[in-house]
């Protein structure tokens, strides 16, 4: 107990020293003039909540303080509490009727109120540009601290995909109220659509810590979590060679949010690569085209689409895509190699397909080639096609030229490799091979003037007149 007197001896002089100013301040706080002056200072500093509290105190002490009503009406208008503000303006005009300046402020209030209502209506009609016009040109001019208008503006900007502006606008809101759930949600969504998923997730998580049952925050947070999980599954399965499973994972991820273009561009590209490996060229082209519709400068998507077009034998399309990709990335040897393959295939596609002319596959044996040649030569001999002689002559030449190449093992190998063959050597006779010789049957063709086209059958000119003999 002896300690307490000692403490009082130390503390009592300090209490007495500070008590007079405290009590004096309490007395000053009840003075309407002092309170009003402080309220005006706080309003000038845009500390509207503090100013509003002081003005409430003024009017409690002096219910007829007209300037306090006007000042409070102005604060309430700034915060878009229009009905309360209208009541204070009306009270001021009761105390001081005929004030043109206050009547003007009241008119501005009604104008801002109507504009805010119109902005909400335009938002429901999805005319988001009109929403911004009402808010920027009217509401925030007369009510610069209107939280409802700022949040509606951020929502309109989000709908217009102006994500950077959403981040900026919600940043101002969170600076004044760091726990504003609507602002946290909108800002998180803006970062999400910019594919900055880590920052988006942090905003969602902060909001959920404040309100774990907030339905929109929960939907946004778990939606993002599931999207990233499905993407990882697609990438992991592709790396393991489980291409069909990977393709289904990519498709599932793309279905989660079709509007998430900044992220979906990578999903489309990943899907395209998997489909190319699966040999599903048509689907791959579609997927890569979706990626390029989002980002036309994506070289990897151009390259993969070129590869996909090779699968569908769209040689010209493949060359076009790969050439563009090569121009954008001239040092990439992989692209250059793919372009060379495409150009070679395009060149090959423009030459005659001798296999097709003889109606045989590319794996046909020498005997198959000879058999097909004999059959077609008999079928299209001009003497047997008097009614369509010109067509028969052309077909006869084609058949002979095809056999000139495919009936010669060396020429066939070179042809299959895609090498250029001297077309002059393809069209006429000049070898020493008679495909109709030997084998127990003798084929003699009679045609006045020799072989059509000036060459004769491959393996000889067969000049003069001769006829079919089946011996």
From Swiss-Prot:
Its main location: endoplasmic reticulum. Induction: By dithiothreitol- and tunicamycin-induced endoplasmic reticulum (ER) stress response. Residues 1-24 form the signal peptide. It holds the Pfam family TPR_16. It comes from the Eukaryota. TPR repeats lie at residues 32-65, 66-99, 112-146, 148-180, 181-214, 227-260, 265-298, 300-332. Keywords: Chaperone, Endoplasmic reticulum, Glycoprotein, Repeat, Signal, TPR repeat. It is found in: Endoplasmic reticulum lumen. One of its GO terms (cellular component) is endoplasmic reticulum lumen. The keyword Chaperone applies. SMART domains: DnaJ, TPR. Residues 353-419 form the J domain. Glycans are attached at residue 64. Interacts with BIP1. May play a role in protein folding in the endoplasmic reticulum. This is DnaJ protein P58IPK homolog B. The gene is P58B.
């Amino acid at each position: 107990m002896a300690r307490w007197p000692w403490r009082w001896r130390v503390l009592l002089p300090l209490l007495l020293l500070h008590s007079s100013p405290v009590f004096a301040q309490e007395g000053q706080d009840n003075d309407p003039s002092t309170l009003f002056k402080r309220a005006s200072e706080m309003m000038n500093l845009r500390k509207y909540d503090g100013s509003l509290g002081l003005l409430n105190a003024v009017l409690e002490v002096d219910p007829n303080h007209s300037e306090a009503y006007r000042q409070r009406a102005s604060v309430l208008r700034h915060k878009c509490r229009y009905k309360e503000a209208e009541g204070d303006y009306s009270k001021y005009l009761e105390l001081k009727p005929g004030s043109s300046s206050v009547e003007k402020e009241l008119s501005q209030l009604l104008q801002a109120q109507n504009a805010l209502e119109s902005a909400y209506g335009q938002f429901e009609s999805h005319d988001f540009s009109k929403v911004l016009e009402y808010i920027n040109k009217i509401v925030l001019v007369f009510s610069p601290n209107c939280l409802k208008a700022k949040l509606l503006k951020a929502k309109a900007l989000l709908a217009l995909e102006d994500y950077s502006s959403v981040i900026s606008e919600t940043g101002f809101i969170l600076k004044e109220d760091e726990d504003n759930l609507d602002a946290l949600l909108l800002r998180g969504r803006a970062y999400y659509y910019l594919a900055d998923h880590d920052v988006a997730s942090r905003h969602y998580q902060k909001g959920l810590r404040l309100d774990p049952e907030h339905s929109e925050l929960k939907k946004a947070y778990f939606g993002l979590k599931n999207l990233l999980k499905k993407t990882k599954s697609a990438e992991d399965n592709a790396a393991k060679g489980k291409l069909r499973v990977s393709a289904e994972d990519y498709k599932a991820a793309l279905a989660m949010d079709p509007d998430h273009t900044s992220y979906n561009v990578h999903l489309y590209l990943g899907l395209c690569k998997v489909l190319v490996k699966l040999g599903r060229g048509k689907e791959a082209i579609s997927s890569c085209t979706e990626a390029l519709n989002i980002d036309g400068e994506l070289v990897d998507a151009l390259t993969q689409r070129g590869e996909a077009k090779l699968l569908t034998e769209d040689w010209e399309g493949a060359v076009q895509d790969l050439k563009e990709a090569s121009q954008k990335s001239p040092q990439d040897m992989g692209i250059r190699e793919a372009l060379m393959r495409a150009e070679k295939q395009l060149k090959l596609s423009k030459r005659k397909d001798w296999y097709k002319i003889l109606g045989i596959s590319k794996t046909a044996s020498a005997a198959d080639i000879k058999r097909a040649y004999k059959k077609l030569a008999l079928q299209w001999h001009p003497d047997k096609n008097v009614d369509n002689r010109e067509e028969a002559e052309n077909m006869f030449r084609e058949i002979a030229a095809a056999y000139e190449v495919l009936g010669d093992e060396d020429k066939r190998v070179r042809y299959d490799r895609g090498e250029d063959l001297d077309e002059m050597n393809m069209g006429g006779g000049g070898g020493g091979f008679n495909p109709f010789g030997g084998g127990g049957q003798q084929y003699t063709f009679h045609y006045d003037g020799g072989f059509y086209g000036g060459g004769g059958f491959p393996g000889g000119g067969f000049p003069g007149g001769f006829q079919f003999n089946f011996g």
